[in-house]
């Protein structure tokens, strides 16, 4: 089980990423634009660096919905491998059954 503080930190990161998404995309467009002058690019880089660190989407971590576990996450179900196996063994995941060959 993940600490409550880690789960709360992820919630804050998601909110910050949503808040600064448009600003971040705008600055990145200026930086990657061929038509921008060097000075405009440099100013855009400085502004991008001044944004909060947690506003970057790459800082987010996908976590299990039940436990908050960050490793072994199965995106299709939103669960960690452990909780997915438990749910599958109880028959709670339609169409999923234990493999045997």
Curated annotation (Swiss-Prot):
Residues 50-70 are annotated as: Disordered. InterPro entries: Ribosomal_uS14 (IPR001209), Ribosomal_uS14_bac/plastid (IPR023036), Ribosomal_uS14_CS (IPR018271). Keywords: Ribonucleoprotein, Ribosomal protein, RNA-binding, rRNA-binding. GO terms for cellular component: cytoplasm; small ribosomal subunit. Residues 59-68 have a biased composition (Basic residues). GO terms for molecular function: rRNA binding; structural constituent of ribosome. GO terms for biological process: translation. The keyword Ribonucleoprotein applies. The keyword rRNA-binding applies. Part of the 30S ribosomal subunit. Contacts proteins S3 and S10. Binds 16S rRNA, required for the assembly of 30S particles and may also be responsible for determining the conformation of the 16S rRNA at the A site. Belongs to the universal ribosomal protein uS14 family. This is Small ribosomal subunit protein uS14. It comes from Erwinia tasmaniensis (strain DSM 17950 / CFBP 7177 / CIP 109463 / NCPPB 4357 / Et1/99). The lineage of its organism: Bacteria, Pseudomonadati, Pseudomonadota, Gammaproteobacteria, Enterobacterales.
């Amino acid at each position: 089980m993940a600490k409550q503080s880690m789960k709360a930190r992820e919630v804050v990161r998601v909110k910050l990423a949503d808040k600064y998404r448009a600003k971040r995309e705008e600055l990145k467009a200026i930086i990657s634009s061929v038509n921008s002058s060097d000075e405009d690019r440099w100013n855009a880089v400085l502004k991008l660096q001044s944004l909060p660190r947690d506003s970057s989407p790459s800082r987010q971590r996908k976590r299990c919905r039940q436990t908050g576990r960050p490793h072994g996450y199965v995106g299709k179900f939103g669960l960690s491998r452990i909780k997915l196996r438990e749910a599958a063994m109880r028959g709670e995941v339609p169409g999923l059954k234990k493999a045997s060959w």
